[in-house]
């Protein structure tokens, strides 16, 4: 129950609320915020940008909400379309960011183990990983000197009727129905 949070949002007159939540609590929070009559701009996580999330809420609750994404499933990029088609054929639902990140993460781990020549020496694998540059489903991933990955980030927005659009990056910006 997020009723005390909803009360605090109302009292603060917040213009935006960042919902750092997974699907189930996020859906409940959004429903309670909207049912309370608050039209605060909602900003969600990649868990809140897929058809799987839309099944948890009536589309009216999501209209205008933005979220960061690792994988906008309708982006006109061959790598995203191919993964999405294969995922749908195997699992019977739209691909989502967690699936794409998990797929790429596993491939990155395998590549690092191959480069290190071991699957059991964590230090060697970490060293190999820091030197990898990888083009995966989510895009180009490279690790910096602090072993932090720098994958691409997309910003998508829910539109009326449960469609999405891509707001960022600019070269993929699209109208409703293409996110």
Feature-to-residue mapping (PLM):
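Extracytosolic ligand-binding ectodomains
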Residues: 1-179
């Amino acid at each position: 129950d997020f009723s005390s949070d909803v009360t605090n949002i109302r009292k603060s007159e917040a213009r935006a609320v960042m919902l750092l939540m997974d699907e189930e609590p996020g859906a409940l929070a959004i429903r309670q915020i909207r049912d309370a009559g608050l039209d605060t701009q909602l900003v969600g996580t990649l868990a809140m940008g897929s058809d799987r999330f839309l099944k948890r809420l009536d589309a009216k609750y999501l209209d205008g909400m933005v979220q960061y994404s690792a994988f906008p499933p309708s982006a006109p990029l061959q790598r995203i379309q191919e993964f999405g088609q294969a995922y749908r054929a195997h699992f019977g639902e739209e691909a989502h960011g967690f699936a794409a990140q998990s797929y790429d993460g596993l491939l990155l781990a395998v590549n690092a183990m191959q480069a290190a020549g071991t699957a059991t020496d964590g230090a060697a694998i970490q060293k190999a990983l820091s030197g990898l540059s990888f083009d995966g489903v989510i895009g180009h991933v490279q690790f910096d000197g602090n072993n932090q990955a720098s994958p691409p980030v997309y910003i998508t927005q829910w539109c009326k009727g449960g469609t999405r659009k891509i707001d960022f990056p600019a070269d993929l910006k699209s109208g409703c129905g293409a996110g």
